[in-house]
Amino acid sequence: MLDKNLFIPGFEPEAQGYGSGIPVITTPININNRRYIGNKTKLNNWIFENIKKVAGDAISFCDPFGGTGAVANEALNRGFKKVFVNDVLPANIYSYNAFIGPGKWNKSKIMDILNEWGKINKKDLDENYCSMNYGHETYFDELTARAIGYIREDIERLRPMLTEKEYYILIAILLYSMDKVANTTGTYDSYLKIKNHKEFKLRMISPYSYDGVKIYQGDANDIIKGIESDIVYLDPPYNSRQYGRLYNLPDKICKWDKEELEGKTAKSRNTFRSKYSTRMAAKEMRDLINKINAKWIFTSYNNNFNAKDARVRNKIGYDEMLDILSTRGDTSVAEMPYNPYNAGRTKITGNKELLFITRVR
């Protein structure tokens, strides 16, 4: 069942400062409060109103391209009894487990740990894996990078004393806190040359425990074969931008395998590459659609079919997408004007979000 006891008695929703330490913000932030390309938070109402119109009696929901988890979280908020959510990127999986995954956690224990971290004097910290790879005025200023690395190492030290849920919560707190101060436009493909360092603050998150959530980590085309759901919501990568590269840094912080990184922008040797961001996208989509066991398929895409910038041009054309989906049932299309978050790299005008609605035969 849902645990809604979020707030800690005696802690006001404001920064608890410790002089030269790290401020602790006790106002909880939500799963969608993260910079991420394709984040559907602002589209949730529109998406679920369209779902309600045709499938108002549905009780199960599957999101095999979960991203931040904002859509899966909204499905839970709207009363779906069973929610399946999947992604391939470790940072997203850690977030799902922290924010919506089942499990027990102790609020006071989490806050005690945060307040101990709040006493850290960053100037006293030694160099570590994070500062060596992501500090030195690149993704983070040097002292912030040292603090991130120290805290991540401390989570591993504390792990024997934590429940699995508490472990994920602490990592998610670090993940969302560092995202607020990263010296980037929102992805971690590269860092800004003009420094805009902000004060690093530890921010409490809003964890819930749902028994009806099932979390997967794998290729959407593989995991979908074992799932039966009233609704399958598809939000595949639209264009050539590879999420495995864009979010390699948070993945490395979450996994903490201390892999040797390469290049000026400090990347793994082999980041995950999605076929949906290549010329194979249509073939992958057709394969996925044929494997789905559901009553309804809702597919998000946008209208960047002829964009001048190849990086944001859709890999699957409108007619091709419609043809693929129509093989499983009658398909209609809803549309909404929408300017997506794109990390500031490309100016997009006249953008519309599309929702393909397929009633499976």
Each language-model region and where it sits:
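S-adenosyl-L-methionine
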Residues: 2-60, 70-78
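Mobile, glycine- and charge-enriched loop segments
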Residues: 48-62, 227-232, 237-239, 258-276, ...
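Conserved proline-anchored active-site loop of SAM-dependent methyltransferases
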Residues: 61-75, 85-89, 175, 225-246, ...
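Short catalytic/ligand-binding loop motif for oxyanion handling, primarily in non-cytosolic enzymes
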Residues: 72-73, 92-94, 177-181, 240-243, ...
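Class I S-adenosyl-L-methionine-dependent methyltransferase module
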Residues: 82-84, 88-205, 244-278, 283-284
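Conserved SAM/SAH-binding loop
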Residues: 217-222
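Conserved Class I SAM-dependent methyltransferase catalytic core
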Residues: 274-330
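Class I S-adenosyl-L-methionine
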Residues: 315-361
